[in-house]
UniProtKB/Swiss-Prot annotation:
It is found in: Plastid, Chloroplast thylakoid membrane. The keyword DNA-binding does not apply. The lineage of its organism: Eukaryota, Viridiplantae, Chlorophyta, core chlorophytes, Chlorophyceae. This is Photosystem I reaction center subunit II, chloroplastic. Residues 1-35 form a transit peptide.
Amino acid sequence: MAVMMRTQAPAATRASSRVAVAARPAARRAVVVRAEAEAAPAAAKKAAEKPAWTVPTLNPDTPSPIFGGSTGGLLRKAQTEEFYVITWEAKKEQIFEMPTGGAAIMRQGPNLLKFGKKEQCLALTTQLRNKFKLTPCFYRVFPDGKVQYLHPADGVYPEKVNAGRVGANQNMRRIGQNVNPIKVKFSGRMMSPAEI
C-alpha cells in the first residue's frame, strides 16, 4: 500500500502541472525596430573629419603647483644632463601626492612640474589619470634648451587601442613555433633575431 501511494502521488502532480501549462495564454510576438542604414555613413564622416594629431608644445611660463618641499637636489644634474617636465590641465585646485615625497596643491588650469627622473613623471601620470581623471603629458628638456616630447608618444596612452600603432618588439608567432633553445645555444654561432 505504501508503495502504491508513492507512485500515485507524483502522477497527480504531473496531471495538475499539465493543466497549468495548457491554461497559459499563447506567447506574445516581439517587434524588432531597426535603425535606417543612413546612420553608419554619418559615423564614418565624423571619423574622417577628425583632425590629425600633432605634438603639443611646451609653454615654460606655465605655473607650478603650490609645493613647500624640494626635489631633493635631483635637478642639479639638469645643468649637465637632462630633466623632465610634466604638464596637465586641472579643473579645480586639488591636493595630490608628489612622487618625491610630500603633497602639493595643483592649480586650477595649466600646471607644470619639473623632475629629475622619467620614472617620477610616470608615477605622477598614473596618479593623475587614475585619481583625478586628467590627461598629463611629459617632455625631456636638454641642457641646451631643446625640448623633446615623450609621453603619450602618439597622443593615445599605451593601454588604449590606436589605429595604425606599430607594435614594438613584437613576434607574430605562437610560443610553440619558437626555435629549440638547444639549437641556438650549442650551434657555435650567433643567430640574428630574424632567424630565431
